[in-house]
Amino acid sequence: MSSRRRVLLKVIILGDSGVGKTSLMNQFVNRKFSNQYKATIGADFLTKEVQIDDRIFTLQIWDTAGQERFQSLGVAFYRGADCCVLVYDVNVMKSFDNLNNWREEFLIQASPSDPENFPFVVLGNKTDVDGGKSRVVSEKKAKAWCASKGNIPYFETSAKEGFNVDAAFECITKNAFKNEPEEEPYLPDTIDVAGGQQQRSTGCEC
């Protein structure tokens, strides 16, 4: 039986404090959501294996603090990223207006080799709030901004309801992999003493 290649991808999630970065990560990795808000201190990360076609990807997803006092830590966390996810709250205009600042800061601190083609994905989160009545950022406005930045993929999500989360992270995985060098390092399958293999995959569609 041929070995499936396991590719490690580093994904950074950026955005203002309170837009739902931690909730999106926990919904995708653990299928859990908490109404209790707790600000991320510095940065934290979770990992999850995603299978797309014949490849198994290990996503290392970094959730970073949105507070300004932690932004100086960025250079240590951003370096080596394969994709950057920009998150805003569709009910808070300021969080959308700040997307450009987060994008520019990432490019400066991460210093990717090809900044013009580095993959970003934008998520407009919290679409569930008040059944959409509190929304202030239209989908049209968000897509126009993404188009102006090189046609960045855009998804509207609800971490609370799990809406579009899997589809967004499948797109994130594919874009991160495109940023990998052709001869990317890979992790071989691990086989336990009973001869079984442990695999996890998502059933998301892009």
UniProtKB/Swiss-Prot annotation:
Keywords: Cell membrane, GTP-binding, Lipoprotein, Membrane, Methylation, Nucleotide-binding, Prenylation, Protein transport, Transport. Belongs to the small GTPase superfamily. Rab family. It is found in: Cell membrane. CDD domains: Rab7. It comes from Arabidopsis thaliana (Mouse-ear cress). A lipid is attached at residues 204, 206 (S-geranylgeranyl cysteine). Pfam families: Ras. This is Ras-related protein RABG3d. The keyword Transcription regulation does not apply. The keyword tRNA processing does not apply. GTP binds at residues 15-22, 63-67, 125-128, 158-159. Intracellular vesicle trafficking and protein transport.
